[in-house]
Amino acid sequence: MKIKSYWDGKESVCIHQPKPYYTAIPGYAYGGLIASLIDCHSTGTAAAAKYRSEKREMDTLPPIRFLTASLHVDYLLPAPLGGVIEIRGRVKEIKGRKVIVESWLIAGGQICARGEVVAVQLPEHMMPDGFKK
């Protein structure tokens, strides 16, 4: 699964069309997909926010990447499949190498899940070679 997140003012947004096999019960997304979307979108938002805070263009060197230190998801409603899923995020805090992002997942016009991710910046010495160039 690959997603792309963009800024929409102070919020980040991702539109995703899940494959029908990401199902829990017929017609609804399984919880692991929901958690993965919140996680991936939130760590991407953390990286984008860090670039912004350093007044740098996205993907300039040295690269900024984040890993999940903590992921909390509250499942509010079953998320229907068959349409697009929207994930929105907002940065709550940037403190050194840590960024806290709150995100919510919208499907069928309703907020189906809320999440909070504590993301930590990957040290440059741990960056895979392909990301350093």
Residue map of PLM features:
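Conserved beta-strand residues within beta-sheet cores
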Residues: K2, I15, T68-H72, E86-R88, ...
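HotDog/MaoC-like acyl-thioester-processing domains
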Residues: L77-K133
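Non-catalytic linker/capping segments at the edges of enzyme domains
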Residues: M1-P26
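Hydrophobic beta-strand-centered segment that forms part of the acyl-chain substrate-binding groove
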Residues: G44-E86
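Hydrophobic residues in beta-strands and at strand termini
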Residues: H16-P18, Y75, Q121
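Amphipathic alpha-helical recognition patches that constitute DNA-binding helices
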Residues: L33
